[in-house]
Amino acid sequence: MVKAVVVTAPDATPEVREINLPPLGHTDVRVRIASAGVCHSDLSMINGTLAPQFPLVPGHEASGVVAEVGQAVTGFAGGDRVVLNWAAACRECWFCVQGEPWLCTAVEGVTSVEGGTLADGTAVNVRLMKSRTLGYEAFTGKSSS
């Protein structure tokens, strides 16, 4: 079990709860979430505008460290720092080839991972992690000296 912020109904007060994690599949990567952002689409899900499935764990944009990989996973290992993308880019369209997978025209969008969660320790199918073009630096501005 892990702790997660859970919203149980539209406009309900978020609560910290312990939730069960599904078993790790052979093509999954389990990530220990270091941080997750709550963006406008999360707020729209929380207030019911986007009609998500409740209960919901908001925060579908996250970064963390790979904790465990499934047997069929290659290219990732425990300890790898990763940024989780909210959608699986095709890596073949014009935008993906240009290094802009967030604009993918064939994207398989997800509000988050299965069950609407990105709780700490959630297993993410490796297809959602194939685009490693974004590092931590893509989410931070350069500090002035």
List each model region and its residues.
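NAD(P)H dinucleotide-binding glycine-rich loop of Rossmann-like/cofactor-binding domains
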Residues: 13, 90-145
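Generic structural detector for well-ordered beta-strands
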Residues: 18-20
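Short, basic and Ser/Thr-rich N-terminal targeting/leader segments
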Residues: 15, 27, 60, 141-143
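Glycine-rich beta-strand-centered segment in the early N-terminal region that forms part
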Residues: 22-36, 46-97, 102, 110-112
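Short N-terminal binding/cap micro-motifs at the start of the first secondary-structure element
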Residues: 11-16, 40-41
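Short structural boundary motif marking the start of a folded domain
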Residues: 1-5
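Sterically constrained small-residue positions within well-ordered secondary structures
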Residues: 7-10, 22-24, 57, 138
